[in-house]
């Protein structure tokens, strides 16, 4: 429906799959957008697109919203008591800087934007395994590896503390504890955790011998940093 609607304009919608759509026809400097992950749980009005094409986008997005509202699929969803899919959020556009080598040799993530940037900069990409045991032997031997664990993003954005705690507990069991053991066993040189609040926590192998330092639970450290 949306693709047919936009075919009558100078824009073209490409739906590569159910999760990722791409809009063609806008110059990259005409519309400045915000990633959906930064908007979830916040007032949408504070993050609406800006730029020379913002008014045009708002007009067409309103028309698309009306089309979606009356679409048979949404009527069926409403009859089943499900939320309506009645809006479109645009983000991810931009101008690539000059090509540069990635700081990571391997990137494990499912986010299409991150994977695209990794491939563009020369890094190998793959989906994250279910746990640390699924990493190939020697995956991080002598090279930097980026692992993106983002299952807790929605819970953090919407303030769902229980779900966030459950997901992070799985991270602790499946990832953090095994990777710490690998660091202690000299299979890794260092670990660096980048939290949702932007803080970085780096642990080198030699830090494990600093027994005089008082241990702090990582959850307490995150809470203190966010206070």
Give residue ranges: language-model regions.
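…; additionally, a secondary subgroup of soluble metalloenzymes is captured
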Residues: 1-227
């Amino acid at each position: 429906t949306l693709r047919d609607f936009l075919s009558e304009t100078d824009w073209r919608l490409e739906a590569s799959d159910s999760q990722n759509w791409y809009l063609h026809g806008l110059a990259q400097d005409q519309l400045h957008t915000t990633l959906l992950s930064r908007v979830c749980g916040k007032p949408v009005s504070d993050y609406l697109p800006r730029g020379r094409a913002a008014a045009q986008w708002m007009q067409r997005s309103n028309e698309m919203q009306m089309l979606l509202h009356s679409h048979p699929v949404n009527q069926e969803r409403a009859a089943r008591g499900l939320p309506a899919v009645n809006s479109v959020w645009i983000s991810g556009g931009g101008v690539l800087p000059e090509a540069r080598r990635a700081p990571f040799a391997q990137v494990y993530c499912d986010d299409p934007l991150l994977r695209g940037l990794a491939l563009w900069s020369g890094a190998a990409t793959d989906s994250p395994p279910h746990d640390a045991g699924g990493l190939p032997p020697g995956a991080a031997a002598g090279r930097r590896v980026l692992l993106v664990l983002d299952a807790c993003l929605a819970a953090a954005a919407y303030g769902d503390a229980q779900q966030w705690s459950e997901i992070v507990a799985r991270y602790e069991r499946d990832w953090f504890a095994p990777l710490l053991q690998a660091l202690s066993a000299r299979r890794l040189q260092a670990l660096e955790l980048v939290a949702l609040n932007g803080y970085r926590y780096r642990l080198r192998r030699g830090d494990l011998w600093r027994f005089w330092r008082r241990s702090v639970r990582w959850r307490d450290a995150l809470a203190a940093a966010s206070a």
